[in-house]
Regions:
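Cyclophilin-like peptidyl-prolyl cis-trans isomerases
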Residues: 1-198
């Protein structure tokens, strides 16, 4: 368990705005420092505000965070982290911003348990940018462990994640009615006293 965590609130709307709710996420900077820094920067930049969850699969996960294209083909890291679409042999000057990615931290011992947040990427290593996915309460996709990086957990509102995972979808697992991430807000950091870990 991490001694210091960062708290982010996601305001969500789905079913044509008929349903709404807040999902609170506790990020783990000790376990996944680069993922947390990147996610926090994207939140603080307002990049996630007004985006959609473009890929929703019941009993599995809901995926969003493509703030450039809104369909899973776009998004990128908040700043230069040394990787250009997974390649760390390219200089920042030779990499377009829309190809900025972050290194995997998937060996951090955190598993894809219900109500966790993990980073989306291609099948190639170190290709996470801004897309992320939330795991509903009825899903434990263990085959992602050690491949995708878990960097936090949903501490409140996982019922909303689970409800959204069951919405009607069309081609490419895209919801028929938009599932909107209205706003993402960095609430602050919390430090837990050491004795809570014993």
């Amino acid at each position: 368990a991490d001694t210091t965590t960062d708290i982010v609130d996601l305001q969500l709307k789905w079913n044509g705005g008929a349903n709404s709710g807040t999902v609170t996420i506790e990020l783990y900077p000790d376990s996944a420092p680069i993922h947390v820094e990147n996610f926090k920067l994207l939140v603080q930049n307002g990049d996630y505000d007004g985006t959609v969850f473009h890929r929703v699969i019941d009993d599995f996960m809901i995926q969003g965070g493509d703030f450039t294209n809104g369909d899973g083909t776009g998004g990128h890291a908040a700043k230069w982290f040394g990787y250009c679409n997974g390649d760390n042999g390219v200089s920042e000057a030779d990499c377009q911003q829309d190809r900025y990615t972050i290194p995997d931290e998937a060996d951090n011992g955190l598993d894809h348990e219900p109500c966790t947040i993990s980073m989306a990427k291609t099948s190639a290593p170190h290709t996470g940018g801004s897309q992320f996915f939330l795991i509903p309460s009825d899903s434990t996709p263990t085959w992602l462990d050690g491949v995708h990086t878990v960097f936090g957990e949903v501490t409140s509102g996982c019922n909303h994640v689970t409800a959204i995972s069951g919405v009607e979808t069309g081609s490419n697992d895209r919801p028929v009615q938009n599932v909107e991430l209205v706003s993402a807000t960095f609430v602050g950091s919390e430090t837990k006293p050491w004795y809570e870990f014993w």
